[in-house]
Design a protein with these regions (language model features):
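Class I SAM-dependent transferase core
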Residues: 1-38, 68-85
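Active-site phosphate/pyrophosphate- and oxyanion-stabilizing loops and adjacent acidic/basic residues
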Residues: 26, 49, 128
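A generic alpha-to-beta junction signature in SAM-dependent methyltransferases
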Residues: 32, 54, 132-136
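Surface-exposed loop/turn positions
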Residues: 35-36, 58, 138
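Conserved beta-strand/loop positions that form the S-adenosyl-L-methionine
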Residues: 40-42
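Conserved SAM-binding loop of SAM-dependent methyltransferases across substrates and taxa
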Residues: 44-57
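Conserved SAM-binding motif I beta-strand of class I
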Residues: 59-64
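S-adenosylmethionine
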Residues: 65-186
Length: 186
């Protein structure tokens, strides 16, 4: 019902959703540090809601600035009785946090500024946005495609420009020929 009216999830194909979005999200579990998580641009709550089932004792904030995803997330939280998630409707540039989360998560993050940027420029934009708004202590995790490979040849150059360390981990998936990656920036 929600998808038909609001296009909350990127696909109508349930199998594709399970094989890609669900699998990608669960692949992050072994990489994320213990502690509070912030899912920026969460949309349908992917990966934040999915991770909340496997980390019931950890606080997960789902951030989105759009009304439809927020209403959907509030409905899901109520129906599934998820006590460990907090839903915040705001833009990351306007968010005020008293304590930096252990990790910040992005999946398919996009806005009018970012959509026109190269992958490297998008990455720099995201890192600067997080560092400026949340402080330098949070690790940043991005679920991405093969565009992450462009960073491998020049990782030291990118690390210097981002003022941090980049770790690229391939997600081993039995479902697709294309590759997915977890980018960790510390």
């Amino acid at each position: 019902k929600w998808h038909e009216q609001n296009n909350i999830i990127s696909t109508r194909d349930r199998t594709y959703f399970l094989q890609r979005d669900f699998f990608d999200s669960l692949s992050m579990l072994g990489h994320l540090p213990k502690g509070a998580l912030l899912d920026i641009g969460t949309g349908a709550g992917i990966p934040g809601i999915l991770l909340s089932f496997f980390r019931p004792d950890e606080h997960i904030t789902l951030l989105d600035r759009r009304d439809n995803p927020i209403r959907f997330l509030e409905h899901v939280k109520l129906i599934l009785k998820l006590e460990n998630i907090e839903i915040v409707k705001t833009d990351i540039n306007k968010m005020i946090m008293t304590k930096s989360p252990a990790a910040v998560i992005f999946k398919n993050f996009s806005n009018k500024v970012v959509s026109k940027l190269s992958f490297e420029a998008k990455l720099a934009y995201i890192v600067n946005m997080v560092r400026n708004n949340l402080g330098a202590t949070s690790k940043i995790f991005l679920l991405t495609g093969s565009n992450a490979l462009a960073l491998q040849d020049n990782t030291s150059k990118h690390c210097d420009s981002l003022n941090g360390k980049i770790v690229i981990t391939k997600i081993e998936t039995p479902y697709f020929d294309t590759n997915r990656y977890i980018l960790e920036i510390t």
